[in-house]
């Protein structure tokens, strides 16, 4: 398939104001309400993260979570956008309205809080999942040794969908490997797969291989990295890794708001190493028939634009979208641009 490349404007939203002063006041009030809603959402996400950090009991390992919007009622497609513009009528005809959001390494469902609110405001149905050993899933990350174990909450969510229901699967960073794994297993359940600065690997490739330019080869990383965790003791192979906070700030959040960095610093958890080092088996008959889309982040220091471009060349998706000014976490640094792209992909026939 040929690639389509769409480059989002650096400014998330452009509001055109006419000569009507009253309209300008309404827009300003709308903007203030949007900021207040976002602040409220952030407080709720922060509260959940603090609660997570204090949890001492263990929960069932297959937990999926939803972080609701600030609205007291569920939005519909006929509701207005936050800028007082009517939602396009063609959204009413969308056959697939459920988005399953899959976080990347160290993150959890909490990282999608802005995306969840925006999708719900548009009348869509976002669902998040905590992968094994991540977010509110209290599985010990040191015990997660395979991609199958890591992806189990996502696989169970897809397996429990109604027979005729399909979803749009969205993966961030190494969550892209889980998306690929799910696409190989359930191509009939996944309408579209969206990779956000993600590890869109080829058959026989490891998720870690995508980061080799930044972190060195897997073999070198396993021998020399200071970020490795030895959950079973130094005499046994490493079980996970975790970047230092200052390292993460510069690597992941170079364009993100301070409040989202603070949320991440108390929420991120160690990353299971086994799934990152596992080679994926992807077939042309199943994975190859899936509809894949890639979102590039052009100010990304964790997965450079050059590496993302290489991924697109080697594993060609149906279309490519680019977000200017976004770091490795566009759901924090450019949430409105990301939202527009998700809507646009949902509307592609």
Curated annotation (Swiss-Prot):
Name of the gene encoding the protein in the UniProt record: MES12
Residues annotated as the enzyme's active site: 173, 300, 328
PROSITE patterns referenced in this protein's UniProt entry, alphabetically: LIPASE_SER (PS00120)
EC number: 3.1.1.-
Descriptive protein name: Putative methylesterase 12, chloroplastic
Keywords: Chloroplast, Hydrolase, Plastid, Transit peptide
Subcellular location: Plastid, Chloroplast
One Gene Ontology term from the biological process aspect of the record: salicylic acid metabolic process
Molecular function, one GO term: methyl salicylate esterase activity
Any one annotated GO CC term: chloroplast
Main EC class the enzyme belongs to: hydrolase
Family, as annotated: Belongs to the AB hydrolase superfamily. Methylesterase family.
Range of the transit peptide: 1-77
InterPro entries: AB_hydrolase_1 (IPR000073), AB_hydrolase_fold (IPR029058), MES/HNL (IPR045889)
Keyword Nucleotide-binding found: no
Known function: Putative methylesterase.
Stretches for region Disordered: 61-80
Primary location group: plastid
